[in-house]
Amino acid sequence: MASASLQFFAFILALFGVFGDITATLLPNWKVNADVGSNIITAITQMQGLWMDCTWYSTGMFSCTLKYSVLSLPVYIQAARTTMVLSCILSAFGICITAVGMKCTKLGGDTDSKSHACFAGGVCFILAGVFGLVPTSWYTREIIANFLDQTIPESSKHEPGGAVYTGFISAGFLLIAGVIFCTSCFNKQPGAGVYPPPQHHFPSTEQESNAGYDLKDYV
């Protein structure tokens, strides 16, 4: 019962991780312009994401421009696009597989089949968490490196946006859920299956008794 409750808790974490992963992939605020120097008095907030660049004005207007050219993008943005999409796909597969393999559901067949399905879903969550953690870390590193570069003007410096933090938290949720599923699927009772129950066979005694019975019949 405790294992089923733990799996349900991991499933809720995985759901939050999936929704956060998809949200972080689509949000345009992976990095925002830094409020340093002359940028403090500006009335424009510039945001850059994986798929579009957006500008928010103090008047309330909002405009976005899609990034149509893939080859013109920096390498870390191309890698972030690929890994975040893979993370979303793997986490969605993990949700479907663990829903079948969880102990609190009536799907998936016998106990062994449900355990293997649950373990496969946990592996999907772990891979999704890794694929979500790599681009957010790389993207953050590039932002910090450009911010500390003295040759870059202050108007071109940026800070990590909300999408990066959402990606970090979602990757953590997926990793925790994957570890819980992988460790809770194959819990067995102590001593079960290790030492088979002793079996006593007395073939010689049975044969002697049968032989004696047969001789008495012929007397």
What are these regions (language model features)?
Residues M1-A34, S38-Q48, C104-D112, P153-Y165, ...:
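Intrinsically disordered terminal tails
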Residues L6-F16, A79-F93, A117-F131, A163-F173:
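Physicochemical signature of membrane-embedded alpha-helices that form the seven-helix bundle of GPCRs
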Residues I12, T25, D53, T82, ...:
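Alpha-helical recognition domains of nuclear gene-regulatory proteins
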Residues T23-L27, T98, V130-E142:
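C-terminal TM-helix exit segments that contain a strictly Trp-centered aromatic cap at the helix terminus
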Residues L27-R81:
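A surface-exposed beta-alpha-beta supersecondary segment
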Residues S58-L71, F131-R141, S170-T183, A211-V219:
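Juxtamembrane/interfacial segments around transmembrane helices
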Residues S63-G109:
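Amphipathic alpha-helical interface segments within eukaryotic helical scaffold
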Residues A117, G132-Y165:
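Juxtamembrane loop segments immediately following a transmembrane helix
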